[in-house]
């Protein structure tokens, strides 16, 4: 599995701000979008382009455009919504596919409750966004759903990832690509990433 830890200074700086215990909802939400945007830039460097001719200000000019059906953004509800706009800043015409999965806090197992995928999801690059890759259960379940729908190319964008989650994801889906702002130390006994960001969903939605 391709694993990319994006070490750009802007990513490090913004993620460092997000780790503060006293960060407010407004700032956390804005930074989640910004880091999501920077991760998107890294994850789309291999998009295929094609040359086309258009009318420029001084006549015909050859330019490059993204080729064919492009992207569907797949936020995992609810926290993934906090990163979605960062992707759409670069790919505003992307289709949105929504997957609702929550983690049972006792068993730590994923529980799916909602799925609405783009009609042509099998023809698109799926970019899954979720702030945390902890145990990997929710991400694996989401990829299972996408592959069952015929999706062949999948990339995962997360703010922070635990080694345990990376290992589980690689074992289940070695063909996907993972882009993260940080590979953190470990999971604690409650299944939270250390040092992590705390509960990203609560911080994005102001329910902490």
Swiss-Prot record:
Recorded catalytic activity of this chain's protein: UMP + diphosphate = 5-phospho-alpha-D-ribose 1-diphosphate + uracil
Keyword entries, A-Z: Allosteric enzyme, Glycosyltransferase, GTP-binding, Magnesium, Nucleotide-binding, Transferase
UniProt-recorded name of the protein: Uracil phosphoribosyltransferase
Residues bound to uracil: 193, 198-200
Similarity annotation: Belongs to the UPRTase family.
Note accompanying the cofactor annotation: Binds 1 Mg(2+) ion per subunit. The magnesium is bound as Mg-PRPP.
Pathway membership: Pyrimidine metabolism; UMP biosynthesis via salvage pathway; UMP from uracil: step 1/1
HAMAP family: Upp_B
Entry EC no(s): 2.4.2.9
Originating species: Actinobacillus pleuropneumoniae serotype 5b (strain L20)
GO terms under biological process: UMP salvage; uracil salvage
Keyword Secreted attached: no
Task of the protein: Catalyzes the conversion of uracil and 5-phospho-alpha-D-ribose 1-diphosphate (PRPP) to UMP and diphosphate.
